Amino acid sequence: MKRVVSIVLLLLLLPALPAAAPGTGAGGGLTVSAPSAVLMEKETGTVLFEKNARDTGFPASVTKIMTMLLIVEAIESGAVSPDDVVTASERAASFGGSCVYLEAGEQMSVHEMLKCIAVVSANDCAVAMAEHLCGSEEVFVRRMNERAKELGL
């Protein structure tokens, strides 16, 4: 399962690589097309490059990566099984944007929900899993923030 998550994460992050890799611009500086970026040296924490580093951005689907991590960790700990059935709530079914159009009461396995989150970036499945794992979206968000702190993010 860890290998699957690693592959999914790699596939999700691959589109960002061309934007960061073109090389140098005129004058020898790094050229980055992203609206903001920070490059730091791992050992010392020295900032090697920054562009709009203090700007606030929105996490978008990056939160789905944390959602998938918590799902996989719940599977590995035995808290849930990939075959467990998840029932979509009215709230989960009401989410738009990237979704698989779950209907309230619709049931899918944890494994299927995880695939929908990874492949489609399904908001409805992410909310259904949050509710399944933690009882509510709010408690799940707190758990994501705790886990992010544990990881030093």
Language-model segments: which ranges?
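Active-site-adjacent loops and short helices of periplasmic peptidoglycan-processing enzymes
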Residues: A19-L153
